[in-house]
């Protein structure tokens, strides 16, 4: 992959980047010259990620951290500044999805998705912004999903969280643009990752709803 920009000298934290979209984003940033830092919730996932980065020729730094836990996030951000350097770029990539019809979903399951997909980006962004303000620059990228704009059966919690993340993105721009902090949201479509495996299996025979029934759009 060729890149036409440079991230030399920049430290990029990509949350949940042991595999999948996060790993691909971090790998692309590394090729542009960034120093890559990532986290995952379990040591085994961090180790798996470190091995994958090493195989790709990338010298990444991995940390075990639950991004829904504010104390752990603050400690991780402080440790990254000590071990590597302050964070210049944050990619809020970590996320989960529960494919359950809304009326079958428990309130606890709904809250868990909101916690990981919306509260965690708030917590991590809040942790890195003060240092960005001090240094006069910063970049935050939120992985919002096309579900921040569209609805679909069985993903009520995920769509609600990603819709909230889209508005959090806009609010960060409004509050912190004056400090030369940019915040953007990206809405990927369906990408072949472990998270979308159940959907691909369900549609493997090619049978699916017609598009106009499959997705509810704004009218």
Protein language model annotation of sequence segments:
Residues 3, 55, 178, 190-217:
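A glycine/serine/threonine-rich, flexible loop-to-helix segment
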Residues 11, 18-20:
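Conserved glycine-rich cofactor-binding loop
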Residues 100-103, 150-156, 178-179:
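Active-site loop immediately N-terminal to the catalytic Tyr-X3-Lys motif
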Residues 101-102, 109-114, 211:
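Substrate-binding pocket helix/loop in short-chain dehydrogenase/reductase
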Residues 125, 161, 169:
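Active-site helix of classical SDR
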Residues 130, 174-178:
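Alpha-helical segment proximal to the catalytic Tyr-Lys
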Residues 145:
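Residue(s) in the substrate-gating loop at a strand-loop-helix junction
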